A protein has these predicted regions:
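Short beta-strand-loop/turn "lid" adjacent to the catalytic site in phosphate-handling enzymes
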Residues: 27, 33-79, 100, 106-115
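Short glycine/proline- and acidic residue-enriched helix-loop micro-motifs
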Residues: 8-9, 68-73, 129-130
Length: 175
């Protein structure tokens, strides 16, 4: 939806690149037009499900970041490889426009070891990265900050329980 106009296109795209090409077409022509050219886009954001312990904040996507995401794919085999395809397609379609990775696990990266370690041999953590990471962090962060706004309290003075209900569900204690 843009400028009060809603445009839908029921379609199946065989590749991320074809889907992005259609998005560009919709944004630059017809009823859904919101820009004249993709050069008007400042940046493209990508939700990345798993940043492991490597990424505690959003970052510009570089070839090194993509390689690290590939290395982290065993931690999220259904999500990270597809996310990488989306990133590569965006780079192909949108050219030099900066791409930014926003990590779902980043919100939970401040958990202390007593909260993220499992009662299993420590070598599993060292060798395989087995630990609690926390998921749906972008959702939990948003809800936490909205709750603080609604309650008219600084976020750092609140202790909250947030719930994410979607295709996946999670509950987080926010301190």
């Amino acid at each position: 939806e843009a400028n009060g106009n809603k445009a839908t296109t029921p379609a199946i795209f065989p590749t991320h690149t074809e889907a992005f090409a259609e998005v560009v077409k919709k944004m630059t022509t017809g009823d859904g037009k919101v820009i004249d050219d993709v050069s008007e886009i400042n940046a493209i954001g990508h939700r990345v499900v798993h940043g492991g312990e490597k990424f505690q904040a959003s970052c510009l996507i570089t070839p090194e970041v993509i390689e690290t995401l590939r290395e982290l794919s065993p931690l999220a085999p259904l999500h990270n490889p597809a996310g990488i395809l989306g990133i590569e397609a965006a780079k192909k379609v949108f050219g030099d426009i900066p791409n930014v990775a926003v990590f779902d696990t980043a919100f939970h990266s401040t958990m202390p070891p007593k909260a993220f370690m499992y009662a299993i041999p420590y070598e599993y953590y060292e060798k395989y990265g087995v630990r609690r990471y926390g998921f749906h962090g972008t959702s939990h962060k948003y809800v936490s900050y909205r709750a603080a706004e609604y309650l008219e309290e600084p976020i750092d003075r609140l202790k909250l329980i947030t719930c994410h209900l979607g295709n996946g569900s999670s509950i987080a204690a926010v301190d």
